[in-house]
């Protein structure tokens, strides 16, 4: 158990650092303060490997630190959904078996259905409502931002994390794959 705790802490730290670095240096603008964010593919990948708690803290800590470095203050209405994305996708840890070298077509479909639903809920609903409640932002603006972020993040995770998970699964040794000559 202690070893798993250490792995979780290390994965959280590395994941949050990658979240910040990728988020600060690799983004493609789409709409007012909304861009394609490649760090969500890495967060989703690590969430599936290490579970919902690690996924949550990668997004929460990573997004918070990224906002601090960006200089415009912490937008909690978007930081919290980043954590929730990792949390939601992380619940797939026990359903998918990439650690055992398995990432079937059914697993790819399951992963992508879940990540699309999680992204739509986080960015299309929770983030815009947070902007309206916390920052008094106009609903017409924030729901457009949320919709664009939902689509961009779902596509980013759908392509990027699916590739990362497939590569990772292929790198694992499947049970019974080794035989004595």
From Swiss-Prot:
Q: What keywords is this UniProt entry annotated with?
A: Cell membrane, Membrane, Transmembrane, Transmembrane helix
For this UniProt entry, what is the primary localization, expressed as one broad class?
Answer: membrane
Organism superkingdom? Bacteria
Gene3D superfamilies recorded: 1.10.1760.20
This protein's GO cellular component annotations are: plasma membrane
Q: Does the keyword Transmembrane apply?
A: yes
An example Pfam family from this entry, by short name, is: ECF-ribofla_trS
Query: How is it placed in the membrane, per its record?
Result: Multi-pass membrane protein
Entry's localization field: Cell membrane
Query: Membrane-crossing residues?
Result: 8-28, 45-65, 72-92, 115-135, 147-167
**What's the family?**
Belongs to the UPF0397 family.
Q: Which HAMAP family match?
A: UPF0397
**Record's protein name:** UPF0397 protein SMU_1935c
Q: What is the lineage of its organism?
A: Bacteria, Bacillati, Bacillota, Bacilli, Lactobacillales
